[in-house]
Amino acid sequence: MRTTRSCFWSGDTAVRFRTLLVGALCFLAIAAASLEPARAAKYAAIVIEETSGKVLFARNADKSRYPASLTKIMTLYLLFEELESGRMTMRTKLPVSRVAASRSPSKLYLKPGQTITVKDAIYALITKSANDVATVVGEALSGTEREFGKRMTRKARALGMSATTFRNASGLPHSKQRTTARDMARLAIAMRRDFPQYFGFFSTKSFRWRGKRFGNHNKLLSNYTGTDGIKTGYIDASGFNLVATVERRGVRLIGVVFGGRSGRTRDAHMVEILNKSFKRVKPGDIRTQIAASSNVVRALPKTLPKSLPVPPPSPDTLPVAPPPRRTRSGSIDLALAGESGYLEGAP
């Protein structure tokens, strides 16, 4: 007699399988849900048009985030101040302490007692993002890295970075070292405004140190037309961060992204929001303040000559090139003030 085996499970087996399947799906759903808030807790982004300060894109721009190695932008800002003041030169040698040499990677693996020039320190911070070099700079400028963190925070306040606190020069993990995407955009704008003579360092694609070549982590310098800065950053608590500056057709944008899941996805998102932002602004749309930052009120006599001499502004005070002749650059509102016979600028 021939025995036929059923290809179907028994009722009990099928019930058990369905129970296991439903349980597995529920577990995966819960796991996925728990991952999303973690990613969202790290993500923030902003794009600003540099000249006008117009915000073209913003997500969580004022939420507190870990800067990671974006911290080194401020370290470089303060180092550039030393160069500007003449207290240091590019050839100044900075000593390496045991504390600096002990910093965890990324690093140049400097040894205690060695020195590094200011110029090489700048390249190492921008390309290799060397943590040992950051501590060397902090100690050279303020004696200890802790004191340097206080100085960094004071400078942040002076630049309008009200939500930023620094505790070290490198961006290595510290629970109280916090910033926002908006504050980092402010720092990038201040860097180019205050130190245009040094800003070109940020477009350096590679740096050689004692026979070794270190490439810049900012891949947009090679992959996104018009990029000329500025810095990447990563620690576990922050995700992959990036501040980028890009200029196309006379329009300069500052982009900041926090919390990327990888360097590649972070860069892709930066390109996406920059592309969208470039489409929203054109060179002719950019407006800038070329005179007073508030209303100007002046009294004039009732009887006026046919023309009033208006001295041109000093070229040194103009943030942008003068417009072509006969270009409408602004307007003046006049109002008659009672019977006194004087004209006053309208408020």
Residue ranges of predicted features:
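Cell-wall glycan-active module
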Residues: 15, 30-33, 327
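Active-site-adjacent loops and short helices of periplasmic peptidoglycan-processing enzymes
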Residues: 31-182, 191-192
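Bacterial N-terminal signal peptides that target proteins for export
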Residues: 3-24
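Bacterial N-terminal signal peptides
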Residues: 22-32
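Domain-terminus/edge residues, biased toward the C-terminal soluble/receptor-binding domains
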Residues: 161-165, 169, 173-178, 182-347
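Short, positively charged
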Residues: 26-27, 50, 208, 224
